[in-house]
Amino acid sequence: GAGMATKLFLRCTTANGITDTGDGVVQDMITTAGSAATTGVVNTITGDNVQVQWTKTAGGLSMAWISGRVPAGGFTLTTCDLDAWCQENNMSANCSVRARVYRYQPGTPTITELGGPFDDDVEFGTSAASMTWIANVTDTAFAENDRILLRLFIEDAPAVNMATGFTCTLTFNAANATTGDSFFNIAETVSFKAEPIVGTP
């Protein structure tokens, strides 16, 4: 119903243990906010209608985020929205943010893109600012132990072409309601399963 939703913070932790998505690092996307801001930095390229997946460091590992496991009974994912703190190091970079949303099914993983891509279409400034936009995904049933996978990209901002030689920074993992509290909202109320504690007897 109205007002029911689940807010999933983009974290820099990797308690999920997932390594089979093809991404360089798969970070947690959970209901608990972080405590200290961290960043991902990505190099720009030249082009029109191009995208570059956000990286942990410039030229480094690509980043993705994944939810906990869906609880018994499952749910249907419908409308999502995002709030990501983004900036470019020079206004000549001509970048904005894009999200791609997927269903991750475990085993030999099946990763299904749920419509999109979903573009904010607002060029970044040169200081960290909250970019907010809607991801109206294809309504998709998630079964128990499925997960939501999120990838963020830079793309060329409207009416301009991305230019090479610059960087864009995503700030995330910060405390709630502070600069860098990047998050992904889903319309449904879902209590994702906690990750198993690794390394305890």
Residue ranges and their predicted role:
Residues 3-68, 72-79, 83-89, 147-201:
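Proprotein-processing/basic-patch segments
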Residues 10, 94-163:
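Aromatic- and Gly/Pro-enriched, solvent-exposed loop/edge beta-strand patches characteristic
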